[in-house]
Regions:
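Polytopic transmembrane helical bundles with strong interfacial aromatic enrichment
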Residues: 1-127
């Protein structure tokens, strides 16, 4: 589906920009552990942006609702997993206490990623 191709390319471009910010701007504000956490968010965003592009290509060739569901799980995973790591890094950069709600969002995002990959697998098997 074209929407997933567009979102995938936008999220990939955003991950490059966020990675550059982490390497050049954020590095001046936080410790190495926080940079590592931030970069994990960037990496997983890029992996799953590329997965969205792949699913978008597959969806153009196959009418399979599982592909759409996989994409929504990948997007939700990016928002929850990478987004929570960006939030955590931002609070640390501002020398603020990280709110407790941020921590459980990260594993939720990881679960969404896993479900997205499993849905993609089922879509490929169903084909």
């Amino acid at each position: 589906m074209k929407l997933f191709l567009i979102l995938g390319t936008l999220l990939a471009a955003l991950s490059v920009a966020l990675g550059a910010f982490g390497a050049h701007g954020l590095k001046k504000l936080v410790d190495a552990e926080t940079i590592s956490i931030y970069q994990t968010g960037v990496q997983y965003q890029m992996y799953h942006a590329l997965a969205l592009i792949i699913v978008g290509i597959l969806a153009q060739r196959n009418d399979n609702s599982l592909l759409s569901y996989a994409s929504f799980f990948f997007i939700g995973g990016i928002v929850c997993f990478s987004g929570s790591l960006y939030l955590l890094s931002s609070f640390r950069a501002m020398n603020k206490t990280v709110p407790g709600f941020v921590y459980p969002i990260t594993p939720l995002g990881g679960i969404l990623f896993i479900l997205g990959w499993l849905l993609l697998l089922f879509a490929l098997i169903k084909k």
